[in-house]
UniProtKB/Swiss-Prot annotation:
InterPro entries: Neurhyp_horm, Neurhyp_horm_dom_sf, Neurohypophysial_hormone_CS
Residue numbers bearing the Glycine amide modification: G28
Keyword Membrane: no
Cellular component aspect of the GO annotation: extracellular space; secretory granule
Native source species: Oncorhynchus keta (Chum salmon)
Domain of life: Eukaryota
Protein name listed in UniProt: Isotocin-neurophysin IT 2
Keyword Disulfide bond set for record: yes
PTM summary: Seven disulfide bonds are present in neurophysin.
Subcellular location: Secreted
Principal cellular location given in the protein's record: secreted
Keywords from the named record: Amidation, Cleavage on pair of basic residues, Disulfide bond, Hormone, Secreted, Signal
Disulfides per UniProt: C20-C25, C41-C85, C44-C58, C52-C75, C59-C65, C92-C105, C99-C117, C106-C111
Segments passing through the bilayer: none
Amino acid sequence: MTGAAVSVCLLYALSVCSACYISNCPIGGKRSIMDAPQRKCMSCGPGEQGRCFGPSICCGKDVGCWMGSPETAHCMEENYLPTPCQVGGRPCGSDTVRCASPGVCCDSEGCSADQSCFAEEEGDNQIGQSEGSNSADVILRLLHLADHTPPHRVHQ
């Protein structure tokens, strides 16, 4: 074989195999990340009452959710830690989406309103129905308004 053919074969083999390189290998090799115990995601928000759901999302059961605000700045550090974290709450969609706050379902990309996240709150909380539903209704209305706002306003 010629040198060019050997080079092409080598480059093809290199692109097909899945290797981790020195700059992005986890400690212990690429398979060690699967064996590592999952840890809770970092706490965030006022009084550290919330948990990070993504680099700019902080949610807590009693405090609601923040997205892209100063309360979420601490969550950026999660990107630099070598082991993955597991957020609390029960699944409310796919494997990566979890109940973050009463009526709110989040993953690392964003949040949405989800009625199934109220069931967890009702079972855990013994306060009156009207007291718990008022804050949940406000959250749902805010999420609803955020989903339906136009991308820009046309001034007349």
